[in-house]
Amino acid sequence: MLEKKATRSTRVDGVSGEAVIEEFERVTRDAANVQRETLRRILAENGGVEYLRGLGLAGATDPATFRARVPLATHADLEPYIDRIADGDASPVLTAKPATSISLSSGTTQGKRKYLLFNEELVKSTMQIYRISYAFRNREFPVENGKALQFIYSSRETRTKGGLTATTATTNVYRSEEFKATMRDIQSQCCSPDEVIFGPDFAQSLYCHLLAGLLAAGDVQIVSATFAHSVVLAFQTFERAWEDLCADIRRGEVSPSRVTSPAVRRAMAALLAAPNPGLADEVARKCAALSNWYGVIPALWPNARYVYGIMTGSMEHYVKKLRHYAGGLPLVAAEYGASEGWVGANVEPGTPPERATFTVLPDIAYFEFIPLKPVAGDGGYAEAEPVGLTEVAAGELYEVVMTTFAGNTRSSSSCMTLVAYYYLQSKKWMNICRFCISVHETSRNLVTCTFAATGHIMFAQK
């Protein structure tokens, strides 16, 4: 039944969470040197690729030569090279290591979604930031031996002319073995079987996520999704579907009108196993006792410690409704990233999402920041020369530029960020604005956030 369990702090991949935090603080304390070393590693690996060969680096790996020789790039500059790779060019065009697949960006450029390279380095950096973020969350909200009710979904996959899989970056991550291992390590193993995550129909997968979560209600310690709107949508669906869910639990069989996919039905049948009228009655009783569904998450998942997902930028719009469903449970803003790669971790998870800040990971990419100065009477911004991670000024607005192991070289991320203060020697940012975060938007002119209602990025000495 739905009983509360005691929790205590846990470990991350066999290492104590405090050790993960200590290593993170070590690299942020030495951010300038770590940034130089990160650039050196990227150029040592990729300096011989076609894109960089003709720029006159001549083996140099220092920031000054790199900035002098390599121009700032937009996605349009890199797109012809990415298209060649997608079409089957196996030579080292942008990266020495081959792309394993193509990621479709969540943003848009001139009305179409962008192609980006995806390789094992991106998987590694994703697992790195997951572990760091979890270590800080677990210090604030400890969990152990639990599961996560994760509303995560794969996207449709296509094949490029060259035979590479093209899908969203999250789908590429979910399909990796490293993802499953990391979720186990950080006590975030999904309640739902893979057949649900990779199911052919979104509505069927959402319904099964809810059903699997109810069946594992006593074990759920984290409720999460990539984006806040996915959690809100899930519980809006729950409001309409709870009676069907109870009926499925009562008879031990998933409704044929709700789920038609044979593979998903087989996977859910293994979870249901047998009728459970006691659990069905308890869920129904708890639902009937709720007032306008306020606090439905802690009511049905009493061991849940927090709700987790991206809640800044355009996702802040959903925080009020999410807080209604969460009742008194903390809302924790997830990591900060762009289509080009990860930027920072939320190292103060107890801070409300509206004030969430993100500390840049200096060893995950080489970062530069273009200062943006408002133009009087114009409504736009004038750009200055980029500065390094340790050169930004508190209270100023910047656009993030990234050089990564995945072939994004001095690539603009179309993210506006505000420097608030330093965390040790790294920067703490507030995400001010992202252009076209939704995969459904079709124009770069559709800016999905405003300066009055967004998250931010901060920097300050602590």
UniProtKB/Swiss-Prot annotation:
It comes from the Eukaryota. Induction: At low level by auxin. Induced by wounding. Jasmonate binds at residues 106, 334-337, 339. The keyword Nucleotide-binding applies. Pfam families: GH3, GH3_M. InterPro entries: GH3, GH3_M. It catalyses: a jasmonate + an L-alpha-amino acid + ATP = a jasmonyl-L-amino acid + AMP + diphosphate + H(+). An L-alpha-amino acid binds at residues 170-174. The keyword Metal-binding does not apply. GO terms for biological process: response to auxin; response to light stimulus. Belongs to the IAA-amido conjugating enzyme family. Catalyzes the synthesis of jasmonate-amino acid conjugates by adenylation. Catalyzes the conjugation of jasmonate (JA) to Ile when expressed in a heterologous system (E.coli). Catalyzes in vitro the conjugation of jasmonate (JA) to Ile, Phe, Leu, Met, Val and Trp. May catalyze the synthesis of indole-3-acetic acid (IAA)-amino acid conjugates, providing a mechanism for the plant to cope with the presence of excess auxin. This is Jasmonoyl--L-amino acid synthetase GH3.3.
